[in-house]
Amino acid sequence: MNEKIPGTRWLRIIAPVLIACIISFMDRVNISFALPGGMESDLGITSQMAGVASGIFFIGYLFLQIPGGRIAVHGSGKRFIAWSLLAWAIVSIATGFVTHEYQLLALRFILGVSEGGMLPVVLTMVSNWFPEKEIGRANAFVMMFAPLGGMLTAPVSGAIISALDWRWLFIIEGLLSLVVLTVWWLMISDRPEEARWLPEREREYLITALTAEREARRSEAPVSNAPVREVFRNSGLMKLVLLNFFYQTGDYGYTLWLPTILKNLTGANMA
């Protein structure tokens, strides 16, 4: 009875989730290297339009946040992310062929829509696989995507622009998303009950633990749908929203503009 429970889920769930999140991060911020790497001059983009092109992504990003989470709960997060990977791969490749700034704006908006459900879906999927005593560590691994994505995007983008040009940056990273799509589809499953690759002892452990936790939550505090008005009146939630707003503003403001600032200050290329 004291035999260690197999940890297959850590590799088969966390690894593809983390890789997919890293690719999504790279695809959303690679424009920060493309703009000073030749895109601005080739397309005649002003600083104001560059800001719009960077920011319009986040308008599209809003649309699938809540629907994505609901799909993961009631449907298949695996299929949702697979379609998302396919969509943003196509959009990224298409961005490599733009000839006008308004084409860029449209594609950046669509990219935001296609990536919008990513984080709610993967965090919901993780909750289907890890009991409460493991969920904190599992989520911490997933949230490593931002620093890891930043570490990878800068040297990879610089190398591609230096060796080829900014158009190939979008094309190559779009093709990389298709590779990740294949890995995602082959490795991951929505729930322990559906995973043929899962050892039986690990499956029994997960189903027993997760079912017991759900039953305990259901008996302690039955969940009901709160009116939208009540959600916005929740002061604790609004403080968290405001805190995250300022964090994301500073984080992405820094990430999206730092390459341009460094080029203007130093006159260096993007390699």
Regions found by a protein language model. Give the residues of each.
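Extracytoplasmic
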Residues: 12-50, 68, 118, 254-259
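Helix-breaking motifs and short loop linkers at transmembrane-helix boundaries and internal kinks
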Residues: 44, 76, 97-103, 114, ...
